[in-house]
Design a protein with these regions (language model features):
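Noncatalytic alpha-helical scaffold of FAD-dependent oxidoreductases
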Residues: 1-235
Length: 235
């Protein structure tokens, strides 16, 4: 990338102005020309929500000021965008070979350089949103013991990929990201498409702990039979 932005937030008692990125203005564009900005606490925490990071740029007209003023309350924001994506899913499937890639990859800090060398060489899709995250010191009981030993780090680097086209005939980037994340001892969000087989899935997630929780909380199997079946989507 030819442009890097580091966003640091700190509390102040007073502000000379307060920016609003829920309507006309667009946060991810503002970072190109603003070195300093003031937002309320809630607006800072949800500063990417209006655009779903920058997904609105993939929808014709949705970054135009007039359309945002007229229909912003119905179209903008992650909840609205998800609602419309579900409504239009049959049409989108006819127009696209596969859905665009929208997922988060959590890479151990000591493996991030390896991951980024691969990313800069192959996908090369930007913007790439990066956020450091701390793992609980006591460990995370839903990660398999062996995979936790592979992670072997208190810090994970969240790499968020939003709106990456995935129409190549011979390469499914969703599947490729999943494989590379596992190769770098990381984790991926499971609200996206999932491709791993059951054996690989439970190399990552702690099957006995999930099974125990399932038996206690859903003893009659009213919901999906197990975590793998709930999250796995071969399509």
């Amino acid at each position: 990338p030819d442009h890097l932005t580091l966003c640091l937030g700190e509390y102040v008692a007073r502000a000379p102005y307060v920016s609003d990125y829920r309507h006309d203005d667009i946060f991810y564009k503002s970072t190109r020309h603003r070195a300093l900005d003031y937002l309320g606490i809630e607006d800072y925490l949800f500063r990417y929500d209006t655009e779903c990071h920058w997904l609105t740029r993939t929808i014709p007209g949705l970054e135009h000021p007039l359309l945002r003023r007229l229909l912003g309350d119905r179209l903008l924001g992650s909840i609205n965008l998800q609602r419309w994506s579900r409504r239009l899913a049959p049409l989108i499937r006819q127009l696209q070979r596969r859905p665009d890639v929208n997922l988060d990859l959590l890479i151990p800090d000591h493996r991030f350089a390896d991951f980024h060398r691969w990313y800069a060489r192959e996908p090369r899709f930007y913007p790439l949103w990066i956020l450091p995250m701390c793992l609980p010191r006591a460990g995370y009981p839903w990660i398999a013991d062996e995979h936790a030993r592979r992670i072997d780090d208190d810090l994970l680097i969240d790499c968020a990929i939003r709106g990456m086209p995935n129409d190549e005939v011979d390469r499914d980037w969703s599947e490729r990201f999943e494989a590379q994340t596992f190769a770098c001892d990381g984790l991926k969000t499971r609200c996206a498409r999932n491709h791993d087989i059951r054996q690989r899935f439970f190399q990552i997630y702690h099957q006995p702990n999930y099974t125990t929780a399932k038996q206690r909380l859903d003893p009659h199997g009213l919901f999906h039979r197990d975590l793998f079946e709930r999250l796995h989507d071969p399509n």
